[in-house]
Amino acid sequence: MKKRKTGFLRALALMLIAMFTLSGCKDETSAAMNGLSIENNIAYDYVLSSSLSTAKGFAADLAVSESGSSNTDDGAVSASAALLVDITDGKIVYQKNPHLKLYPASTTKILTGLVALENADLSQVAAIDESIRIDEDNVWICDFRVGDVVTLEQALYGAIVNSGNDAAIIVATTVAGSISSFADMMNERAFELGATNSHFVNPHGLTNEQHYTTAYDLYLIFNEAIKNAEFVKIASTVKYTTSFTRGKYTIVPTWTNGNQFINGSVAAPNGMSVICGKTGYTEAAGYCLVILSESQTTGHRFISIILNAQSRDKLYNQMSYLLEKASYQ
């Protein structure tokens, strides 16, 4: 695939920041996250959300939630942030703290998938080096190893369907040569989409104080990702079986989608169909979920997001609440 080209992004960001500084506008400079505070250290990531119409790639049909806009929260959602957008009408139906900076956990892999699909051929042989090793306990992996012969497509299914953090690293190093170079691509693409309150340092979403996003930025990123048919195909896959070589052996893993709406563990409310989505969890991020759904009555499509729910049960209960609200639209 032809690689995307960027160049004027940082200059544009600095110009916008200067404009807002002169006019006296203020952005949120930090967000409390489980006792941590994320400060605005990187200039181009902090253009006000109300300036999104000036960012490259910002479309007129996107729902706009300006910084400081009031919540429609009715107390039913206890998660730190939530957002429900009718993407057919470009209308925000429900929002709670849409611009609060939070850890995204594996919802990061939405952007990882988008960048990979836009910049690489899925059939190419993936690059697996020592960077695949993750020095953390209790990290979900596909158990790829140095020397395995896999394609980028297999790694991407491993990253999105199985949420394997090692698979996400393979995607990054295959597409960009290194994790840091891929993170640069992620940040540039996010900025193009108007996701200016986010910053990414890795392709998997494991906790780092400099790796964060907002519910609204995730909406912008996911809204772009679902325009890619291959992304929707991967993110809607219930179960994926593949095979690859490891020395003289053939490895045949089967991965099941952890999204309980996709794998059938949780039923969507009456009148709603869940199409695809991405889960996320770390201790710092809490339970996270991004969903594309459709009303069986009106045909309207919705993006719904929950960030930092306190438990898996609460995550799915609160997401079901958003989907039920969508069914009434």
Which ranges hold each PLM region?
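C-terminal motif of bacterial Sec signal peptides marking the signal peptidase cleavage site
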Residues: F20-G24
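Alpha-helical transmembrane segments of integral membrane proteins
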Residues: L9-R10, E153, V232
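Active-site-adjacent loops and short helices of periplasmic peptidoglycan-processing enzymes
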Residues: E28-Y216, A225-A229
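Hydrophobic alpha-helical transmembrane segments of integral membrane proteins
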Residues: A11-L14, S106, S273
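Membrane-anchoring helices that localize proteins to membranes
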Residues: A13-L14, C25-D27
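Bacterial N-terminal signal peptides that target proteins for export
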Residues: K2-L12
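Alpha-helical transmembrane segments
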Residues: M15-M19
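Domain-terminus/edge residues, biased toward the C-terminal soluble/receptor-binding domains
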Residues: K26-E28, A195-T196, E209-Y212, Y216-D217, ...
